[in-house]
Amino acid sequence: MDAIKKKMLMLKNDKENALDRAEQAEQAMKDAQEKNVKLEDEINDLNKKIRMVEDELDKAQESLKEATEQLEAATKKAADAEAEVASLNRRIQLVEEELDRAQERLNSTVEKLTDSEKAADESERARKVLENRQGADEDKMELLDMQLREAKMIAEEADRKYEEVARKLVITEGDLERAEERADLAETKARELEDELKTTTGQLKSMEAQATKASEKEEAYEEQVRDLSAKLKEAETRAEFAERTVAKLEKNVDDLEDALYAEKEKYRGVSEELDQALNELHNM
């Protein structure tokens, strides 16, 4: 009888111990599952952060590309404007040289015309002197008449040359006016190009500043990417460690489940033995 009671007490203790171990195994399994869920959430958060950084890096690279294209376009436009200004300056210089040559020709023509007028005046004075000399011989008179005709011819030639010079002067003045108009237009165009060049230069400086900022921003992004890459590597290491830990925990859970199953089997066996002992006790 004492042996049966002692055996029943042992079976009861074994049953309680089995229940405690089963509860501990279930709690350990729950803790392992919660830890596994937490690690999976951390890995998902890291993946989201990595995708966000990659998107920001793509946007920064696109902005840098656009700024570089605008800078190249502005540089080409400035170079074209400088070339056009240089061409206009050369044309203005050629017009000024042509104007100087026309002025020289005009001065030479006016000087020749002045000489012709002086010769005509001298011939007229000589003719008057000859007319006053009533007693001069006929040969001298004929000579003077011939000189007078020559003087008239010279005067007519001078008048013709004067008209020709005047006509050329009018043409030259027209050419000069047109040249001055072209020069004014060229100066206006040059001023417009200078203003446009200043504006373009300002835009170029602004774009260079933007490109510098974009470069700095890109460097900052690259630094962030390096940091995030390091963090990603660390996270991957942690994830690998977590995966190994999860695998280990899953193995522990499996072991605990096996132990729980064994304890349940043991509990069932103890219960059966206890029931059998109770039946034997009742039969006695």
From Swiss-Prot:
Coiled coil region boundaries: 1-284
Alphabetic keyword roster: Coiled coil, Repeat
Biased composition (Basic and acidic residues): 112-134, 186-198
Pfam families: Tropomyosin
PROSITE patterns referenced in this protein's UniProt entry, alphabetically: TROPOMYOSIN
Entry-linked SUPFAM superfamilies: Tropomyosin
Domain of life: Eukaryota
Comment on protein domains: The molecule is in a coiled coil structure that is formed by 2 polypeptide chains. The sequence exhibits a prominent seven-residues periodicity.
Function: Tropomyosin, in association with the troponin complex, plays a central role in the calcium dependent regulation of muscle contraction.
Family according to the record: Belongs to the tropomyosin family.
Protein name: Tropomyosin
Organism field: Branchiostoma belcheri (Amphioxus)
